[in-house]
Amino acid sequence: MPLELELCPGRWVGGKHPCFIIAEIGQNHQGDIDVAKRMIRTAKECGADCAKFQKSELEFKFNRKALERPYTSKHSWGKTYGEHKRHLEFSHDQYKELQSYAQEIGIFFTASGMDEMAVEFLHELNVPFFKVGSGDTNNFPYLEKTAKKGRPMVISSGMQSMDTMKQVYQIVKPLNPNFCFLQCTSAYPLQPEDANLRVISEYQKLFPDIPIGYSGHETGIAISVAAVALGAKVLERHITLDKTWKGSDHSASLEPGELAELVRSVRLVERALGSPTKQLLPCEMACNEKLGKSVVAKVKIPAGTTLTLDMLTVKVGEPKGYPPEDIFNLAGKKVLVTIEEDDTVMEESVESHSKKIKA
């Protein structure tokens, strides 16, 4: 059983706990704090467990040339990449305001720290857990410093190899045992054949003591629901209020109706996973009573006869008798009373045979 960890106060993940659903707002708020609040409320109303943002301290995430390069994309909010990113970046005070709003309406709030200084700020903000974006998963100094903070970590694995993920595990585990990996492919939108959900099972084999989850960038909800069926214990999906808005993430994000349907479907699948024990269930009793078959006499069998298989057949019988799987065990047993042709073989009719009648 994968390790269970308390990802947020009172909210555990792993084991038999419900999948933890993260609504990734990222920077789909368009740099507008009122839109950001609407998205937090949407995440709450749709049933997500957590609203998540992306926090950067731009001078620590990008070098000067990266910030100064021209940015002429249709998604641009400025002439340079730096201007574009600054438009989308909330201040520390705005983050505190958003956190307070999330607490007020009752949803967990966190962010990906996109650089070491952002992690420092989020630590001061007292977020319940750190999200490590795929771009920092192989940033080992960052991982070490983040792990040493002692907060739970959710680590995405887009753009990484299995060898790299093994190294990540070896680095983080001794410093902070409370973390999980998310299978992720960094493409927007993600094509189904590139989702590679089987990696979830491989992670479960290689890292049996941590929960495994899925971060999806595909369109629709089917692949994410399948990930939960495969055992994903944390599920992250980008959300938007309008897929047509400016920004490269919107097309791979879920609108409110889709997010609500995702949450409903995940909870339905979790109920459907049920128990690994195969048994006749109470809900099957009516069908078993109507359609369940019993061992029936193929011919008239006089009292004192030793049963052979050619004397017996299987039919829907009234009343119910021995189930079909008992027929081989009945062979060789002595009949105590005469059984008429086409009658059900009952317990009291056969010598020394324990009753296995399904009821």
From Swiss-Prot:
GO-annotated cellular components: cytosol
Alphabetical list of SUPFAM superfamilies matching this protein: AFP III-like domain, Aldolase
Cellular localisation: Cytoplasm
Superkingdom of source: Eukaryota
Alphabetical list of InterPro entries matching this protein: AFP_Neu5c_C, AFP_Neu5c_C_sf, Aldolase_TIM, Antifreeze_III, Neu5Ac_N, Nonulosonic_Acid_Synth, SAF
Phosphoserine modified-residue sites: S275
Tissues expressing the protein: Ubiquitous.
Reactions it catalyzes: aldehydo-N-acetyl-D-mannosamine 6-phosphate + phosphoenolpyruvate + H2O = N-acetylneuraminate 9-phosphate + phosphate
Function: Catalyzes condensation of phosphoenolpyruvate (PEP) and N-acetylmannosamine 6-phosphate (ManNAc-6-P) to synthesize N-acetylneuraminate-9-phosphate (Neu5Ac-9-P). Neu5Ac-9-P is the phosphorylated forms of sialic acid N-acetylneuraminic acid (Neu5Ac). In contrast with human ortholog, has no detectable activity towards D-mannose 6-phosphate.
Keyword flag Acetylation: yes
Start and end residues of each AFP-like domain: 294-353
Predominant localisation class: cytoplasm
Cystine connections: none
Swiss-Prot/TrEMBL GO biological process terms: carbohydrate biosynthetic process; CMP-N-acetylneuraminate biosynthetic process; glycosylation; N-acetylneuraminate biosynthetic process; N-acetylneuraminate metabolic process
Name assigned to this protein: N-acetylneuraminate-9-phosphate synthase
Pfam families xref list: NeuB, SAF
Modified positions (N6-acetyllysine) in chain numbering: K61, K74, K79, K290
Enzyme Commission number(s) of this protein: 2.5.1.57
GO MF assignments: N-acylneuraminate-9-phosphate synthase activity
Classification via PROSITE patterns: AFP_LIKE
